Structure formats: C-alpha cells, structure tokens
Amino acid sequence: GAWKTPVLFHSASRNPITFMTEDTFKTVQRRKDKGKHYLCGGTSFNVGVEAQYEQLELELPGVLPDMEKWVAKSREQLANAVYADVGEIEGHILVLFDAHVDKLLTVRAVRLTPSLEISTEEEDWSQYIHMPYAANQEIEPQKNNESDEEELVELL
C-alpha cells in the first residue's frame, strides 16, 4: 500500500531528501518488485553514480522493464512533492538511520544507483548525534486522508 513520507528539498544541491530505516532499506533492496517503490523514482534522478565495490558483490535484483511505469510515476510524485517551481532536480538523497528503543544509533546520507545500490557518494552523520534527545515519543500513524492540507506526500 501507499505510505505518506516527508520529502525535503535541499535547494543548494537541487536534491529531494527522503528518510528510511536501515532495515527497511535492506528489505526494499532485495524486493523483486522494487520498481514499485518510490526509491526507484528517486534514484532515477541520480545520473552517473557508481556503486561502491562491496555493493557490486551483492547481486541485487534489477528493476524489471515492466516496472518502468511505476518508476516514472514515483519520479513525478517526488518532483511534485517539492513543488514544480524549484526548477531542475539534480539527484536524490536518502537519509538512512538505525534506532534501538529510544536511542538513535547511526545516521548516514547516501546517493543510490538505479538498482538501489549504495553509491560512492555516502556521508556518515553519526558523529552529530548528541544526547539528550527525545527518541521515545510515541507517534500515532497518520490516516491517509486526501483532504488534509499537510506537507506530506503519498508515495507508492
């Protein structure tokens, strides 16, 4: 099903930014139908990125040709999420994080290849995690209500 997710836009680099846990990302990477996931639409903006050497050895499934319509739809949704007046989108950045109970353990920003491999463009931001912070807040999932005028975008 569809999820609502925040999409930020870094105007200096002209990149939309999305967020995901490390575990969810690993699951999406290995899906045979991953072309339906919004990440593939995001990575379609990442032209000319190269996978890290260790990522090449994973032999991840590629995006099947029959999934291209989903990739195009996700790409359009991401572009619309940051509004059309931003101009040309230069790429997509995924912020991956790992948390345990109430502690944020790691955070990194990555640029992905079209087959969802981590590219050579990666930054570890874990050094910026400082205590105290409140990570134990309970948040109720939002209902998908199309009449809401919120700053979230529904991505497939």
Where are these regions (language model features)?
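Aromatic- and glycine-enriched beta-alpha-beta binding-site module
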Residues: 2-54
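Extended, compositionally biased interaction tracts of eukaryotic scaffold proteins
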Residues: 38-41, 45-79
